[in-house]
Regions:
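Short active-site loop at a secondary-structure junction
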Residues: 57-73, 77, 81
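Small-residue-rich helix-loop
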Residues: 55-57, 141, 327, 334-487
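Conserved serine DD-peptidase/penicillin-binding transpeptidase domain
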Residues: 31, 81-367, 484
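Beta-lactamase-like hydrolase cores
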Residues: 20-62, 89, 137-143, 487
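Bacterial Sec-dependent N-terminal signal peptides
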Residues: 1-24
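A short glycine/serine-rich beta->alpha loop
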Residues: 59-64, 263, 377-380
């Protein structure tokens, strides 16, 4: 190539880049000038992954509530600190004296968790559901020769030191609902259940509580529900403090004649796991027990040495991260946060996890001035993070060969998967944009990567708080803005 040709090529490249930058700035101006956003707080950043050049921005340093986009900060750090091949384990242990000749144990059987959020999951691919995993555990105990246990089946979730499992500063309204499930050292069935409600035929009548799936031992429900018009959907809420056996259900469900199911969070999954293992041993192998199941925190017995009978392993962390970001699973993100804290400082708490995550990104050159992280999932409304924080973290990921492949594959594809499946149809973003969404009342955010027509990759983050339009309207406006990043 001649010198003149090289100069011409460079000139054309710069011209195309400037044109794209001008078009994006125009789209940002249109978005930020929208009448529905005149009272809103907005932060937008678009950065070149390779060079670190800020392509376009609007209030890039303004910290806002980003909702579930926080999961990207947690999962990226988890892949870096724990590594993509990390697996969680769950152990069957026993203490006391075991007579192999008689099959009698004068001691307890322990279901010792190490934070696996997928244990007994009904939704994680490649994982046995709760009934299946309890069968595996019961079979292992039986094959080890235990037939009579003069003690208890004990659930042990002490791998994490945050006993009640919930995130820092979560709202009361969220705690009993499935997305507010706490993260424990021992989890089961993704720590949620279905509450079955018998619908009533007339407006104002009280639906009847028809049980739970799975059965929740010792949990009672105070029913404050009423029946609303057909088509009103699920407007019920379950209020359950962690480790409490009393729940309040209020709100409305539609009139009808069938069973209406709503999802709630288990108040004590550690005890629930122990209970179901004990029931499985009784029904499948006629194992006898002297005492009922228990949570280790309620045991009040001397701590004795234990021996391990059997170990169950989770899928690789890369697969768990993929489901976390594709389906926005709060429990998985919160478990990762506590595990990071445990691995880095032997303290499995949200605070320790947050400090470890911050230190991880600081070590990679990310400026965290004004960065306030309260949990791992984004459920806390007190998270305050700017779009510049997000793109700086994404750029660090994009230039880290150990993290990037698994992380990028975990992001929803525009128009195809996860929370972006029903967006971007027929636009240039399909096949070129991947992003994690975040939403709560009056909050919307999208953070991810966009591939340019010339193959360059941009990372972006858009956060909007306190818009005045509907959820579908703000989603449409944000979609138009993100499409412009791919044109």
């Amino acid at each position: 190539m001649s010198k003149n040709s090289t100069i011409l090529f460079f000139f054309l490249l710069v011209s195309v880049s400037l044109f794209a930058q001008a078009a994006l700035n125009k789209a940002i101006t249109k978005f930020t000038s929208d009448i529905d956003l005149q009272n809103a707080s907005i932060s937008i950043s678009v950065m070149d992954v390779q060079t670190g050049l800020m392509i376009a921005s609007f209030n890039p340093d303004r910290v806002l509530t980003p909702a579930s986009s926080v999961k990207l900060i947690t999962t990226g750090a988890a892949l870096g600190i724990l590594n993509p091949n990390y697996v969680f384990k769950t152990e069957l242990q026993y203490d006391g004296l075991f007579n192999a000749q008689t099959g009698i144990l004068d001691g307890n059987i322990y279901l010792k968790g190490y934070g696996d959020p997928t244990l007994g999951s009904p939704e994680m691919v490649g994982v046995a559901d709760m009934n299946g995993v309890m069968s595996q555990f019961a079979t292992a105990i039986n094959q080890a020769g235990f037939t009579k246990i003069n003690g208890k089946i004990v659930g042990d979730g002490t791998f994490f030191q945050s006993i009640d499992g919930i995130g820092m500063n979560w709202q009361w309204d969220d705690l009993g609902n499935y997305y507010g499930a706490g993260a424990y050292g021992l989890n089961v069935n993704e720590n949620y259940y279905f509450l079955n409600l018998q619908q009533m035929p007339l407006l104002g009548m009280q639906p009847k509580i028809a049980g739970t799936e799975p059965f929740l031992p010792e949990v009672t429900f105070t029913n404050r529900l009423t029946s609303a018009s057909i088509g009103t959907g699920d407007n019920s809420s379950i209020y359950t403090p962690p480790l409490n056996d009393e729940s309040i259900v209020r709100g409305t469900i539609p009139v009808g004649s069938g069973i209406f199911r709503v999802k709630g969070s288990m108040p004590d999954p550690v005890f629930t796991a122990a209970y179901f293992l004990q029931q499985k041993l009784k029904t499948d192998f006629k194992t006898t027990f002297k005492k009922a199941a228990a949570n280790f925190d309620d045991l009040n017995e001397p701590i004795l040495p234990r021996k391990t009978i059997y170990t169950q392993y989770s899928p690789k962390l890369s697969a768990i991260v993929e489901r976390t970001n594709l389906e926005s699973v709060n429990l998985y993100a919160e478990t990762m946060l506590r595990t990071i804290g445990q691995v880095q400082s032997s303290t499995g708490t949200p605070n320790a996890g947050v400090e470890a995550v911050k230190n991880f990104w600081l070590a990679r050159g990310v400026d965290l001035k004004g960065f306030f992280m309260e949990d791992g999932s984004g459920l806390s409304a007190r998270n305050a993070i700017s779009s510049k924080h997000f793109v700086s973290i994404l750029r660090a990921i994009g230039n880290d060969g150990a993290i990037y492949p698994s992380f990028y594959e975990s992001l929803p594809k525009a128009g195809e998967t996860g929370t972006l499946k029903n967006m971007f149809k027929g636009t240039k973003a399909v096949g070129k944009l991947r992003a994690k969404s975040g939403s709560m009342t009056r909050v919307r955010s999208y953070t991810g990567f966009a591939t340019r027509p010339n193959g360059k990759q941009w990372c972006f983050s858009v956060i909007v708080n306190n818009y005045t339009c509907t959820g579908s309207e703000i989603r449409s406006k944000l979609q138009d803005l993100m499409v412009s990043m791919c044109e």
